Design a protein with these regions (language model features):
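Conserved acidic
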Residues: 391, 395, 408-411
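Short acidic catalytic loops
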Residues: 73-74, 405-415
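Histidine-centered active-site/metal-ligand motif
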Residues: 75-77, 285, 321-322, 414, ...
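Extracellular glycan-binding segments that recognize GlcNAc-based cell-wall polysaccharides
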Residues: 585-706
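Short catalytic-loop micro-motif centered on adjacent basic/acidic residues
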Residues: 409-412, 437, 458
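Secretory targeting and sorting signals
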Residues: 2-33
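N-terminal hydrophobic targeting/anchoring segments and the immediately downstream early-domain regions
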Residues: 32-387, 394-401, 418-429, 435, ...
Length: 706
């Protein structure tokens, strides 16, 4: 070879290499060559930490019809470890000190779980377990342990990567359970705990943001408006909605059926929660309160909650014959309501095996009651009386109307059927879509009423075949009303959750693709523990929810998976409809205070007045209506169509009533009690007793009345 030619070629090769290097350094990156972490990958994840075990880019944008995609979990409790006194749920969603600090058991569970008292009550057995979390996780988290953290942030991240796009984080606590539980590191005020959990949710957002390079860059995005949520989902991130599920919101407890809160307390409480970002909430949970009666719990858990109800309110649950086909859960010491047939059979076998432990739990519950107080026995009357006699109170109706005024969504799952019926009637009168049933606690007879309003329903996280079967039961109704469907995992909420697959055949095979097809999920690994939905169960921790959805698919539920992936759109449409709501009505509230008398007003009731009834009156004039005025008489007030207030002191107009009956209206009479010179309004022609009926004022829209 000619050495000069070889040298010449070498020189050109060298020049080419130099130019290529310059291009790589100064020019744009070659197509497909990553210049660093992708947008969905953190730049600074703590080490060590849980793995996510998902590859592929999260889907973004919309489908061909302009709809967002992704499944919704409308009921989960990320921060329940901050409620109930701080030591009922062990472990945290995140910790600045790392995974070993976040995923560790409560101090009293060491060395062998013998003091895991709440586990004994809710799960039976003796509570013994290996308390060590990171890195071994021998015994927890588990689908059947109510007291160990299930929503570590990296597990939530895996759910997002697996297709979730809406997460409703319900702040939860219970002051009575907190006060009764032996171990706590803080006070038991419910609203203080709710505020802390909201704060921690925002701190989690900042924690994730820091991993991704700064504020706003992370995948965990708290949203307060539906259009904001839609934008977040289109970016491929997780929209997080704040909710509240507590037993005595705003301090609205009842003692011996006497309310301990006022309209002003409700308004202040709703204003505060809305300002903090809360957009959905329950008005009652577990205990009958000043707003509504509850849907009973069953089994040992129901027994414990009924005891707590007495300690909180001085009253046990009280039943009455149901007015229709809808009914509340049975109270007796039997199995928990909500299990599948197979689950009931398994639970029955376990109950027999753990009879001694269950008897011990019952003894502990009875021991919490004052001496001489016994739990009522409901078993003999369950067939004839299975409904809570307590419904939606006048204060509760005011709270429902207050939520519609603030465009918040009402959760009705824990309401008694009487309360749910009354709440739905209020919302129907208002033509308000913001009604939710998010974890399978609503009587299914209300389903069409919820869909007709434009509300949203999710199914509880049962075994995959059972969930699919339940989803299909009302698929035709969803198609009729254009409603979406979702999941309510209720993780960290002491709920029954699915364990290992009952059938060994046709297992979930790893790795598998996410429902959209764009990501690949392998077995999830945390520390030394490898999780598998086939042997551990989808209800073990939050990172296995995508695996459980894959289980739905492989067991013949592709149609259900397809519908779940439209759930985010369905939830947002319900939320969006609340934003466009403007009620033509104002509440007309009847109140009473001893030694003062009655008043009926569209303004907040003064201090000391209790609520007796609520109606709706029109805010603006309409054909066939007349205006009513409130007038002060001594310490009470009367209503009149006379702008001059019949010579009494004017307090202002209350609204317009119809002069003739219209659909949904009730008559409104002015009544008088001569012995105490007291006026009041009623929709009863007999004026509720031997009182004087002074005349018909008009016709108001029914909400509730005496």
């Amino acid at each position: 070879m000619d050495r000069r030619r070889a040298f010449g070629r070498s020189r050109y090769v060298l020049i080419g290499l130099v130019l290529a290097m310059v291009t790589l350094v100064l020019g744009p990156a070659a197509a497909g060559a990553p210049a660093g972490p992708q947008w969905w990958e953190p730049v600074a994840r703590p080490a060590p930490d849980s793995q996510v075990n998902v590859s592929g880019e999260p889907f973004t944008g919309t489908d061909a019809q302009g709809r967002v995609r992704g499944y919704v979990d409308a009921h989960v409790h990320l921060m329940s470890n901050e409620g109930f006194g701080g030591r009922l749920v062990c472990g945290k969603v995140f910790s600045a000190a790392g995974v070993a600090d976040a995923l560790k058991d409560c101090p009293e569970h060491y060395p062998d779980g013998v003091l895991a008292l709440f586990d004994m009550i809710t799960n039976g057995g003796d509570g013994r377990h290996d308390p060590n979390g990171w890195p071994t996780f021998r015994d927890w988290p588990a689908h059947d342990s109510a007291t160990h953290q299930q929503t570590y942030y990296a597990w939530v991240e895996r759910a997002w990567r697996g297709g979730q796009r809406v997460l409703v984080n319900d702040m939860v606590t219970n002051g009575v359970i907190c006060s009764l539980y032996f171990f706590k590191d803080r006070g038991c005020d419910e609203m203080t705990a709710i505020r802390l959990q909201i704060q921690k949710t925002y701190e989690l957002q900042a924690y994730v943001d820091a991993m991704y390079g700064g504020a706003g860059k992370g995948w965990f995005r708290v949203v307060t408006e539906p259009d904001q949520a839609r934008k977040v989902i289109q970016e491929g991130k997780l929209a997080v909605v704040l909710g509240v599920e507590t037993s005595e919101p705003f301090g609205c407890k009842q003692v011996l059926d006497n309310a301990r809160c006022t309209m002003a307390d409700i308004d202040r409480g709703l204003d505060e929660l809305h300002r903090l970002g809360v957009r959905s909430m329950f008005l009652c949970h577990k205990f009958d309160n000043a707003l509504c009666g509850v849907r009973f719990d069953s089994g040992t858990q129901g027994m414990a909650i009924n005891a707590g109800q007495f300690l909180s309110t001085g009253t046990f649950w009280s039943t009455e014959p149901c007015a229709g086909p809808e009914h509340d859960n049975p109270i007796g010491f039997g199995l928990a309501a909500g299990l599948t047939a197979e689950g009931r059979a398994d639970a029955g076998a376990e109950a027999g095996a753990d009879a001694g432990a269950e008897a011990d739990a019952h003894a502990r519950i009875r021991g919490a009651l004052p001496e001489g107080v016994e739990l009522p026995q409901y078993d003999a009357s369950l067939q004839a009386a299975q409904c809570n006699r307590r419904g939606l109170t006048a204060l509760g109706e005011y709270a429902v109307l207050g939520m519609t005024k603030r465009n918040m969504m009402l959760e009705i799952d824990h309401m008694s059927v009487k309360a749910a019926n009354q709440a739905l009637r209020v919302l129907e009168t208002q033509h308000y879509s913001g009604v939710l049933s998010t974890h399978g606690w609503m009587d299914e007879n209300w389903t069409e009423r919820v869909y007709r309003l434009g509300g949203f329903i999710t199914g509880h996280m049962y075994e995959a075949p059972a969930f699919a079967a339940e989803a299909r039961e009302h698929a035709a109704l969803r198609a009729k009303y254009g409603a979406g469907y979702g999941i309510g995992t209720d993780m960290n909420g002491f709920a029954w959750l699915p364990g290992p697959r009952a059938a060994a055949g046709n297992p979930v095979r790893y790795p598998f693709r996410s429902p959209d097809g764009g990501s690949v999920l392998d077995r999830q690994v945390t520390g030394q523990r490898v999780w598998d939905v086939n042997t551990d169960g989808g209800g073990t921790h939050y990172g296995l929810v995508p695996d459980w959805i894959e289980d739905i698919r492989v067991t013949g539920g592709q149609d259900v998976v397809d519908e779940l992936m439209q759930g985010a759109e369905g939830y947002l449409r319900t939320w969006e409809r609340t934003r466009g709501h403007s009620s033509p009505y104002a509440p007309l509230v009847r109140g009473y205070r001893p030694h003062a008398g009655h008043l009926a007003s569209s303004r907040p009731l003064p201090a000391g007045f209790t609520h007796e009834a609520v109606w709706n009156v029109l805010r603006d004039p309409a054909p066939g209506t007349i205006r009513l005025y409130e007038c002060k008489v001594a310490d009470h007030s009367l209503l009149t169509p006379d702008p001059g207030c019949e010579g009494q002191q004017p307090l202002g107009p209350v609204g317009y009533v119809y002069t003739k009956p219209v659909p949904g209206s009730v008559p409104l009479y002015r009544c008088y009690i001569p012995s105490v010179f007291d006026h009041f309004v009623s929709n009863r022609a007999d004026c509720e007793g031997p009182y004087v009926k002074e005349g018909l004022l008009g016709h108001a829209m029914a909400v509730s009345g005496p």
